[in-house]
Amino acid sequence: MHQQKRQPELVEGNLPVFVFPTELIFYADDQSTHKQVLTLYNPYEFALKFKVLCTTPNKYVVVDAAGAVKPQCCVDIVIRHRDVRSCHYGVIDKFRLQVSEQSQRKALGRKEVIATLLPSAKEQQKEEEEKRIKEHLTESVFFEQSCQPENRAVSSGPSLLTVFLGVVCIAALMLPTLGDMESLVPLYLHLSVNQKLVAAYILGLITMAILRT
């Protein structure tokens, strides 16, 4: 007797929920960003019901805050910010998407999406750039501090090889260029333009290395 294949029972709250994006940023000076779209994906072989909850529902309008997603399909959820005021700048709100099977009420999974209102996209880019610079400086200071004791133990200044290479590069740049017929320097000491460019590049690297010591 052929038995019907049963779907395994799903544990409440453990089902992964796939939403994109996971962060919404609204800019007060850009009205086109006042409407954002969340995409909910259903990669499973059964249909899902969904519901959108919010920590501050008075600030947002959610189009189709509840509905269903067919198996292996997706649905777009439109979210509009309707209270764009300076007092809300930087405040983090949260949306929660709960999903369940169509035949049941218990939530199988949930996913939180944060939403933030910022005054301007340009200010946001500036803050991110300043943050990157600050992180870079912090990393470089840490690197120098960790290497200073070893550097002091090895030498207190540039090595003799570095100084010698620097002198050679300076001398190479002072030599005449190929084609300079009025020079008193022997022809075999005339350097090409490419050779002088290489010498200048190496001299620049040496100068940077000396300045860091």
From Swiss-Prot:
Stretches assigned to the MSP domain: 16-143
What membrane topology does the annotation report for this chain?
A: Multi-pass membrane protein
Matches recorded under InterPro entries? Ig-like_fold, MOSPD1/3, MSP_dom, PapD-like_sf
Q: Show the SUPFAM superfamilies listed in the entry.
A: PapD-like
Q: Which domain of life is it from?
A: Eukaryota
Q: Where is this motif: Nuclear export signal?
A: 205-208
Q: Does the keyword Membrane apply?
A: yes
Compartment(s) of residence? Endoplasmic reticulum membrane; Golgi apparatus membrane
What the record says about the induction of its expression is:
May be up-regulated in response to cell-cell contact.
Q: Which GO terms describe its cellular component?
A: cytoplasm; endoplasmic reticulum membrane; Golgi membrane; nucleus; perinuclear region of cytoplasm
What intrachain disulfides are recorded? none
Q: Name one GO biological process term.
A: cell differentiation
Q: In which tissues is it expressed?
A: Widely expressed. Shows highest expression in ribs, and slightly lower levels of expression in heart, kidney, muscle, thymus, calvariae and lung. Also detected at low levels in spleen and liver.
Q: Which UniProt keywords apply?
A: Differentiation, Endoplasmic reticulum, Golgi apparatus, Membrane, Transmembrane, Transmembrane helix
Where, by residue number, does the polypeptide cross the bilayer? 159-179, 191-211
Keyword Endoplasmic reticulum (UniProt): yes
Return the PANTHER family for the record.
MOTILE SPERM DOMAIN-CONTAINING PROTEIN 1 (PTHR34441:SF2)
**What exactly does this protein do?**
Plays a role in differentiation and/or proliferation of mesenchymal stem cells. Proposed to be involved in epithelial-to-mesenchymal transition (EMT). However, another study suggests that it is not required for EMT or stem cell self-renewal and acts during later stages of differentiation.
**Could you tell me what this protein is called?**
Motile sperm domain-containing protein 1
Q: What organism, scientifically named, is this protein from?
A: Mus musculus
